[in-house]
Regions:
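C-terminal binding/interaction regions
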Residues: 2-78, 83-159
């Protein structure tokens, strides 16, 4: 995949600027992002037995909501008509693995929406479990793959 040689969100004199995508064709675009929330054994054991509900389901819904509100949080991010958002939160060894998928048909990509969904889902896991342990760590919020657009497809590899 070709890499740009300059940052895209600045004008010719260095001021922050929203990229003009008005001349770009609408194409199908997808992005998948992930995050990992490192949890203690005590937190892992408490999750299935929580009488107040499932914190992982709350995190999943928070991630979906976050994807839909990304343009309100990231200053130069375009508001996009998302056609699909899916967030999965799975318990794995030592924590919760979050995977977020965003899709649109539009003039710009959905990487920020997928990343925001994964990050907010991870923050929500923290929020919902912090009463049990303050040493929770959020790691590796990262883009796993993207499709569509002039920069082409990207895949980090197996995840």
């Amino acid at each position: 995949m070709p890499e740009d040689t300059k940052l895209s969100h600045y004008d010719d004199i260095g001021n922050a600027s929203m990229v003009d995508v008005s001349a770009k064709q609408d194409t199908r675009r997808t992005a998948t992002a992930s995050a990992f929330v490192e949890l203690s054994a005590a937190v892992m054991a408490a999750l299935p037995a929580n009488p107040k509900g499932n914190p992982l389901e709350v995190a999943r819904i928070a991630g979906i909501q976050a994807a839909k509100r990304t343009a309100e949080l990231i200053p130069m991010c375009h508001p996009l008509p998302l056609t699909h958002v899916d967030v999965q939160v799975d318990l794995v060894e030592n924590g919760a693995r979050i995977t977020a998928l965003a899709a649109t048909t539009g003039p710009t990509g959905v990487e920020m929406e997928a990343l925001t969904a994964a990050a907010v889902a991870a923050l929500t896991v923290y929020d919902m479990t912090k009463a049990l342990d303050k040493r929770i760590v959020i790691r590796n919020v990262q883009l796993e793959s993207k499709t569509g657009g002039k920069s082409g497809d990207f895949s980090r590899g197996s995840f």
